C-alpha cells in the first residue's frame, strides 16, 4: 500500500514538473564560469539549498507563508546544471501561478545569487528577467552635499574679494610715496656746467638758478 502511494505521489509530481509545463521555470547555472577552480559540484545538497531558497522567497508573498521545501519540485536536472522547477499548492494539488513565483524570485534574486556565490549572468531564471539591485541611499543627504559645495564657493569668493581690496589699498598708498621720492631726487640732482656745480631748475620754487643767468642779466637790475 505504501509503495502504491509513493508511486502515485511520484507520478503526480512528474506530471506537475516537466519542461514547458504550466507555471514551470527553467534555471541554468554556470558555476565553473563564475568560480573557476573553486567551482563546486551540483548535487542533492545543492538542490536542497535551491528548494529552500525558493520556499523562503515564496513565504514572503502574501498568503503563501505556509510554503515548505517539499512544495518545490525539480525535474530534468542535467550535468551542465540546468533544470526545471515548479512550486505546488498541496491543498489543491496543483502548481502556484507563475506570476506569484516570478514576483517572489524577483524580490529575492540577490539573496538566491549570494547563496550560490553567483550573479544574474551565472544563475539564470530564463523566464524571469533579472532586476538591478535597489540603489543604496548615501549616508549624507544630497542636499547637504550641494549646500556644502555652494558654501565653499561663496567663502572662496569672499576671501578673494578681501585680498583684492587689501592689495589695491596697498598699491594706492604706495603711489604717493613714489611721487615724493621722484621729487626729492629732482631737487637733489646736480649738474655740472663749465666746471661749476649748479641746480638747473628749482622744481618747487619755480625760479631759475643764478648759475644759468647771463652776465648782463646779473648786472641789470630788475
Swiss-Prot record:
Stretches that traverse the bilayer: 142-162
Effect of residue 75 to A: Increased dimerization leading to hyperoligomerized. Abolishes processing by BACE2. Abolishes localization to the cell membrane
Domain notes: The cleavage site containing the double Phe-Phe motif acts as negative regulator of shedding by BACE2.
Processing and modification events after translation: Glycosylated. Glycosylation is required for plasma membrane localization and for its cleavage by BACE2.
Residue positions, PTM Phosphothreonine: 214, 220
Annotated compartments: Cell membrane
Domain Collectrin-like: 21-222
Positions bearing the site annotation: Cleavage by BACE2: 125-126
Cytoplasmic topological intervals: 163-222
Subunit structure: Monomer. Homodimer; dimerization prevents CLTRN cleavage by BACE2. Interacts with SLC6A18; this interaction regulates the trafficking of SLC6A18 to the cell membrane and its amino acid transporter activity. Interacts with SLC6A19; this interaction regulates the trafficking of SLC6A19 to the cell membrane and its amino acid transporter activity. Interacts with SNAPIN.
Outcome following mutation: residue 93 to I: Loss of localization to the cell membrane. Abolishes processing by BACE2. Loss of localization to the cell membrane
GO cellular component entries: brush border membrane; cytoplasm; extracellular exosome; plasma membrane
Function summary: Plays an important role in amino acid transport by acting as binding partner of amino acid transporters SLC6A18 and SLC6A19, regulating their trafficking on the cell surface and their amino acid transporter activity. May also play a role in trafficking of amino acid transporters SLC3A1 and SLC7A9 to the renal cortical cell membrane. Regulator of SNARE complex function. Stimulator of beta cell replication.
Biological processes per GO annotation: calcium-ion regulated exocytosis; insulin secretion involved in cellular response to glucose stimulus; positive regulation of amino acid transport; positive regulation of L-proline import across plasma membrane; SNARE complex assembly
Effect ascribed to mutating residue 76 to I: Loss of localization to the cell membrane. Abolishes processing by BACE2. Loss of localization to the cell membrane
Family the entry assigns: Belongs to the CLTRN family.
Segments on the Extracellular face: 15-141
Membrane topology: Single-pass type I membrane protein
Pfam families: Collectrin
Signal peptide: 1-14
Name of the protein this chain belongs to: Collectrin
Keyword Signal recorded: yes
Tissue: Kidney; collecting ducts. Pancreas; beta cells of islets.
Gene Ontology MF term list: protein homodimerization activity; transporter activator activity
Amino acid at each position: 500500500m505504501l509503495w502504491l502511494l509513493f508511486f502515485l505521489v511520484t507520478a503526480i509530481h512528474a506530471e506537475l514538473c516537466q519542461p514547458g509545463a504550466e507555471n514551470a521555470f527553467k534555471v541554468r547555472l554556470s558555476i565553473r564560469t563564475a568560480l573557476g577552480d573553486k567551482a563546486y559540484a551540483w548535487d542533492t545538497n545543492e538542490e536542497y539549498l535551491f528548494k529552500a531558497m525558493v520556499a523562503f522567497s515564496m513565504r514572503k508573498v502574501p498568503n503563501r507563508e505556509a510554503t515548505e521545501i517539499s512544495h518545490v519540485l525539480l525535474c530534468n536536472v542535467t550535468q551542465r546544471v540546468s533544470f526545471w522547477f515548479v512550486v505546488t499548492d498541496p491543498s489543491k494539488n496543483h502548481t502556484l501561478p507563475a506570476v506569484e513565483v516570478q514576483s517572489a524570485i524577483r524580490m529575492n534574486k540577490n539573496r538566491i545569487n549570494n547563496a550560490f556565490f553567483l550573479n544574474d549572468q551565472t544563475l539564470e531564471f530564463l523566464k524571469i528577467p533579472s532586476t538591478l539591485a535597489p540603489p543604496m541611499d548615501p549616508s549624507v543627504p544630497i542636499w547637504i552635499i550641494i549646500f556644502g559645495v555652494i558654501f565653499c564657493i561663496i567663502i572662496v569668493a569672499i576671501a578673494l574679494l578681501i585680498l583684492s581690496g587689501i592689495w589695491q589699498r596697498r598699491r594706492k598708498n604706495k603711489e604717493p610715496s613714489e611721487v615724493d621720492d621722484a621729487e626729492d631726487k629732482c631737487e637733489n640732482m646736480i649738474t655740472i656746467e663749465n666746471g661749476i656745480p649748479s641746480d638747473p631748475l628749482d622744481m618747487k620754487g619755480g625760479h631759475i638758478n643764478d648759475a644759468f643767468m647771463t652776465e648782463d642779466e646779473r648786472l641789470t637790475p630788475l
